[in-house]
Amino acid sequence: MAKYTDAKCRQCRREGTKLFLKGDRCFTDKCAFDRRPYAPGQHGRARKKVSDYAVQLREKQKVRRMYGILEQQFHAYFTKADMAKGVTGANLLSLLERRLDNVIYRLGFANSRNQARQLVRHGIFTLNGRKVNIPSLQVRIGDTIEVPEKSRKIPVLAEAQEVIARRGCPAWLEADGANFRGVVKALPQREDIQFPINEHLIVELYSK
């Protein structure tokens, strides 16, 4: 399966914002973006004239990297969002948020989306009582994600209650750290996504 090989901190510096790809490390003084908040490379500090297209492209790349999705799959999400009823940009973000790996990250069962993706691929979680290993699976209202008893001693999962208390949980999800369970209460709305994203730029880019 194709994946990013570029350093995670380099991706944040290239996009000019924290993408929280390294989980808790991003909140410490070890964060490379805090120490060097400019693009990587010899000319990273140089000021460049940025075109409208470049701004749109950077916004798309930022969101794509944040969710850890390659271009072909991201474009497929956009196509699906564009064909659905409602606002295309909001539809796109809802589809991204409803990915199983993202939901597990939001519930506090992983420190980053990448870690959540790895845990899903190893079959650590069950969805409605059935073992799943597909990170891109779309959750629905009423779905229950749970960690089986035998997997609850995995360090990152054992810390779930602490992570949930520290990071909180979106209103559309219900996290039960004590029982290693999460429930999808509703579909994510635009206001549930606090990360600074200008989805209109992505729509403009793909509409050219």
UniProtKB/Swiss-Prot annotation:
Keywords: Ribonucleoprotein, Ribosomal protein, RNA-binding, rRNA-binding
Cross-referenced PROSITE patterns: RIBOSOMAL_S4 (PS00632), S4 (PS50889)
UniProt protein name: Small ribosomal subunit protein uS4
Organism: Nitratidesulfovibrio vulgaris (strain ATCC 29579 / DSM 644 / CCUG 34227 / NCIMB 8303 / VKM B-1760 / Hildenborough) (Desulfovibrio vulgaris)
Keyword rRNA-binding: yes
Origin: domain of life: Bacteria
Description of how the protein assembles with itself and partners: Part of the 30S ribosomal subunit. Contacts protein S5. The interaction surface between S4 and S5 is involved in control of translational fidelity.
Gene Ontology cellular-component terms listed: small ribosomal subunit
Domain S4 RNA-binding: 98-161
Family: Belongs to the universal ribosomal protein uS4 family.
